[in-house]
């Protein structure tokens, strides 16, 4: 017997199938007028700070690969955090945590 929980788990197994959830996350966290760019592709999502004075601007990205998902956070100076997750739901939780961190840093340093 197939349960609804099993169906939902099977449906939300990729970045592409979580598009609405990811877009809503971006809109809710970065609605304060931050100058950011949102890039969504089938197996890649990025939130990048648009700063012409910085050749290496702050960037948050999630990549889907054969082993799972890689979430990378660049703070504008160096690679600050990399998390590998085998499961999309855990990867999205990490992505959300780091998106909040990115927004907080943009607010703190008034980079919007």
Please state what every model-predicted region is.
Residues 97-108:
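Short arginine-rich
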Residues 7, 25, 91-94, 98:
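Charge-rich, solvent-exposed alpha-helical interaction surfaces
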Residues 76-90:
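A short, exposed loop/beta-hairpin motif centered on an aromatic-Gly-Thr core
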Residues 53-80:
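Short aromatic-glycine-(Arg/Gly/Cys) micro-motifs in beta-strand/loop hairpins
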Residues 1-53, 77, 108-112:
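Negatively charged, low-complexity tracts enriched in Asp/Glu with abundant Ser/Thr
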